[in-house]
């Protein structure tokens, strides 16, 4: 058994990647999976949950985010659906997320505060507080987001901002390394200094992939990507200091093929 708690991400409907991750788990190469609770028809949702539960792999659940139509801090931003439809959709999505966590025995539910329209940060902060008032679960774990993506701002980019958003409602946090690097590049901050600020938070999960050197855009690149610019020395120094905190790899394209190799890359970086 490896001396770190590494995991990989899989969508609820991605059976090919789940099969690969089950083999990696059986081999002892990973110790958990992060399940993206993407919206699915009810029957398919229950069927997929059953298959994941049957794998016996410990699970972290990732709640749907704005890419799935769930945008807590500004539900109607960048969305032309009627507001009543949006709100009903979010309620159903969060209900399914809690159901997934219950079924899979997940102790962690990763949450994004969301994106908002330029100039709307104050309103977004208030809306997110309202969201937490209506969705109060001790498993909710707030993740830091890049400062911007595709031209729109996102809420909760630094340790200080996450703490302010969480207030007393959320006590657990997810540190996403490439998101923090994108924020540091965009705001011209020191990545190492911003990383240090997370020592004051109760970080329950790490997210890891790579970004291009100097980039402000989160691309979920491989750890050994030739254009990678993430400060891996600083990242792995923190991972070793907090070896008991799970670290989840997150990739988007060709996941089944990418994860098999990236688990090995991670092991090599850890050994170094």
Feature map (PLM): residue ranges:
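C-terminal helical cap(s) of enzyme catalytic domains, especially alpha/beta-barrels
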Residues: 256-272
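Gly/Pro-rich active-site loop or hairpin
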Residues: 70-91, 152-156, 179-244, 253
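Active-site beta-loop-alpha junctions enriched in small/polar residues
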Residues: 9-13, 36-40, 64-66, 114-116, ...
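Active-site acidic/histidine proton-transfer and metal-coordination neighborhood
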Residues: 72-172
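Active-site glycine- and acidic-residue-rich loops that bind
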Residues: 37-43, 115-125, 148-159, 179-192, ...
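Hydrophobic faces of well-ordered beta-strands that scaffold small-molecule active sites
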Residues: 2-10, 31-35, 59-63, 109-111, ...
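Acidic (Asp/Glu)-rich catalytic clusters
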Residues: 21-28, 42-68, 95-105, 126-137, ...
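N-terminal pre-domain/capping segments
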Residues: 1-88, 92-95, 172, 272
């Amino acid at each position: 058994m490896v001396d770190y708690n590494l995991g990989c991400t899989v969508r609820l409907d991605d059976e090919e990647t789940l099969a690969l991750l089950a083999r990696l788990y059986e081999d002892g190469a990973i110790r958990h999976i992060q399940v993206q609770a993407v919206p699915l028809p009810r029957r398919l949702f229950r069927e997929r949950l059953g298959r994941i539960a049957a794998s016996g792999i410990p699970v972290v659940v990732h709640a749907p985010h704005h890419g799935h139509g769930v945008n807590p801090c500004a539900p109607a931003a960048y969305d032309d659906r009627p507001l009543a439809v949006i709100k009903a959709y979010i309620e159903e999505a969060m209900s399914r997320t809690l159901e997934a966590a219950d079924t899979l025995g997940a102790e962690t539910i990763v949450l994004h505060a969301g994106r908002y329209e330029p100039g709307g940060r104050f309103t977004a902060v208030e809306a997110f507080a309202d969201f937490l008032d209506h969705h109060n679960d001790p498993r909710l774990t707030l993740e830091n987001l890049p400062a911007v993506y595709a031209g729109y701002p996102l809420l909760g980019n630094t340790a200080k901002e996450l703490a302010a958003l969480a207030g007393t409602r959320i006590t657990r946090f997810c540190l996403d390394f490439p998101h923090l690097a994108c924020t540091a590049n965009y705001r011209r901050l020191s990545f190492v200094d911003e990383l240090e600020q997370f020592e004051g938070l109760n970080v329950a999960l790490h997210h890891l992939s790579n970004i291009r050197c100097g980039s402000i855009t989160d691309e979920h690149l491989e750890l050994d990507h030739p254009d990678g610019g993430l400060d891996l020395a600083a990242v792995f120094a923190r991972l070793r200091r907090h070896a008991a905190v799970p670290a989840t790899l997150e990739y988007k394209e060709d996941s089944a093929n990418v994860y098999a190799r990236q688990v090995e890359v991670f092991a090599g970086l850890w050994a170094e």
